C-alpha cells in the first residue's frame, strides 16, 4: 500500500464553504486547473459515481465510498489490479480549518498506477488546495 497526504490550515474559509465547493463535482473544472470535465452521476451519496476527465488523461468513473457531511468524503478509482482512494478531510482546529487530501493506492499493480496517475495527483495537491481556498472564499 502507498499513501501520500498534503495538508493546509487556513482561517480564510469555513468547513461549510469548502464542503460546498468540493462536493459540487459538476463545477470542479471552474477552479481545478487539472480537470477538463467532471459530472456527478446521480446524487452526492455513498455508492454513487462521477465521471472525471483530467487534462491530458482519459475519462474515468469514480465511486463515492465514504461521506461524513462537512468533515470528509472518500472516492475510489478502480484500475486493472489496483484501486486508488482519494480522502478529502476537513477538521476545525484552533489555528483554523485543516484541509487534508490523502491519496492511497492498493493492489498488485499499484506501482504502475502510482507512476502513471497517483504521483501527478500528489504533485498538484498544494496548488489544488490553494485554488480550493481561493474559490471557496467566494461562496
Report residues per predicted region.
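N-proximal short alpha-helices
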Residues: 1-4, 37, 63, 98-102
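A short, structured loop/turn motif at beta-sheet edges
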Residues: 12-16, 65-70, 89-98
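Generic recognition of short, well-ordered alpha-helical interface segments
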Residues: 13, 30, 59, 120, ...
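Beta-strand/loop substructures that line and gate deep hydrophobic ligand-binding cavities in soluble
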Residues: 78-127, 139
